[in-house]
């Protein structure tokens, strides 16, 4: 049995697009900072190879991810945002639509889309997941993107 497993490495040139929601920007900026730190420091990716596309809210992320994925210029996409539960069902609908949309785009277009979108019951939970107590979901998304690029490269070489 062959096991395909890869670490985060800097073997190949990588182009990774980041799509980030402006809604809840005070939280999302921490996600972006975490992602960029990982991509530059660990991934050794040049800033010019990391376009950052700002969209109004999390709901708008999938359409931009779809357009970017079809360009075939990027090895991965990182989606960043924050969806906070309110007193309506809006939170549930948005969360489901965004995650389903990104998953479908990833599978359809064979590009890893790393989801660093916080879904939280309240603003305190969101802040904790953006780098205070519970790690940084932006950093985690960047690490996942780097690892997925390497796994896909290994699978492509072993055809």
From Swiss-Prot:
Binding site for 5-amino-6-(D-ribitylamino)uracil: 23, 58-60, 82-84, 115
This protein's pathway: Cofactor biosynthesis; riboflavin biosynthesis; riboflavin from 2-hydroxy-3-oxobutyl phosphate and 5-amino-6-(D-ribitylamino)uracil: step 1/2
Database matches in SUPFAM superfamilies: Lumazine synthase (SSF52121)
Database matches in Pfam families: DMRL_synthase (PF00885)
Catalytic reactions on record: (2S)-2-hydroxy-3-oxobutyl phosphate + 5-amino-6-(D-ribitylamino)uracil = 6,7-dimethyl-8-(1-D-ribityl)lumazine + phosphate + 2 H2O + H(+)
EC assignment: 2.5.1.78
UniProtKB keywords: Riboflavin biosynthesis, Transferase
Binding site for (2S)-2-hydroxy-3-oxobutyl phosphate: 129
Any single GO BP term: riboflavin biosynthetic process
Enzyme class: transferase
Residues at the catalytic site: 90
Any one Gene Ontology molecular-function term assigned to this protein's record: 6,7-dimethyl-8-ribityllumazine synthase activity
GO cellular component: cytosol; riboflavin synthase complex
InterPro entries (alphabetical): LS, LS/RS, LS/RS_sf
Subunit structure: Forms an icosahedral capsid composed of 60 subunits, arranged as a dodecamer of pentamers.
Family under the similarity heading: Belongs to the DMRL synthase family.
Protein name: 6,7-dimethyl-8-ribityllumazine synthase
Organism field: Buchnera aphidicola subsp. Baizongia pistaciae (strain Bp)
């Amino acid at each position: 049995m062959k096991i395909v497993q890869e670490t985060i490495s800097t073997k190949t040139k990588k182009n990774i697009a980041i799509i980030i929601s402006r809604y809840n920007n005070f939280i999302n900026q921490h996600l972006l900072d975490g992602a960029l730190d990982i991509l530059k420091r660990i991934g050794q990716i040049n800033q010019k190879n990391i376009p950052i596309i700002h969209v109004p809210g999390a709901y708008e992320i999938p359409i931009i991810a779809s357009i970017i994925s079809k360009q075939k210029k990027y090895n991965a996409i990182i989606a960043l945002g924050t969806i906070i539960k309110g007193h309506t069902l809006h939170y549930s609908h948005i969360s489901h639509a965004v995650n389903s949309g990104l998953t479908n785009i990833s599978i359809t277009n064979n590009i890893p889309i790393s989801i660093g979108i916080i879904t939280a019951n309240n603003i305190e939970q969101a802040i904790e997941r953006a780098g205070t107590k519970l790690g940084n979901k932006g950093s985690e998304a960047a690490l996942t993107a780097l690892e997925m690029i390497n796994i896909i490269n290994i699978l492509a070489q072993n055809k």
